[in-house]
Design a protein with these regions (language model features):
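Generic hydrophobic alpha-helical scaffold/packing signal
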Residues: 17, 30, 42-49, 80, ...
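Reductase modules of NAD(P)H-dependent flavoproteins
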Residues: 1-22, 57-170
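Beta1/beta-strand and adjacent pyrophosphate-binding region of the FAD-binding site
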Residues: 27-34
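Classical protein tyrosine phosphatase
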Residues: 34-64
């Protein structure tokens, strides 16, 4: 019989598991991250490209990640290269854009761009076709609000953007 004297209290705080988002029913998926907000996006990319094959309408995925400098871009560079490599044998086109927001110049490297991402350009490009686009943003509130405003503006122009976001604050 267990003793009640040796109790251990455990507190778990989430989220845990996978995001319950039905992005597989969209032709175009745009994933936008700021800083450590890349974490759930890596999970989504792995599910799309390395997970169990399931029925999907996805034709293209654009992943945009903004970090201050080259150091932070290395956090998940191995995963990015791996996902990009396996996407080449997929019918789904993967485009990866990593923005070094404080960099004036960018060292030579796969996926790297200097300055803040031009979300207007990226979201407008993803919604060129009449097919609905799924937009997921995870990052600081300012980034999420900016992407939301652009998506709303595009919706007013008749483009369809289904928007989901996660924010973090410290």
């Amino acid at each position: 019989m267990a003793s009640t004297e040796n109790r251990v209290w455990v507190r778990a705080d989430g989220p845990y598991g996978h995001l319950n988002l039905d992005y597989h029913r969209y032709s175009h998926v745009v994933l936008i991250a700021g800083g450590i907000g890349i974490t759930p996006i890596i999970g989504i990319l792995k599910e799309i490209f390395a997970g169990k094959k399931r029925r999907s309408r996805i034709q293209s995925v654009l992943m945009v990640w903004s970090v201050p400098s080259e150091g932070e871009s290395g956090w998940f560079m191995d995963e990015m290269k791996y996902l990009y490599q396996i996407s080449n044998s997929s019918s789904i086109k993967l485009e990866i854009k990593i923005h070094l927001s404080r960099a004036k110049e960018v060292p030579p490297g796969l996926f790297l761009n200097s300055g803040r991402p031009d979300l207007d350009k990226y979201l407008d490009g993803a919604t060129q076709e009449r097919a609905p686009c799924f937009v997921f943003v995870c990052g600081p509130k300012k980034l999420v609000n900016s992407a939301w405003d652009i998506s709303t503006k595009l919706q007013r122009k008749g483009k369809i953007c289904h928007f989901h976001h996660e924010t973090f604050q410290f």
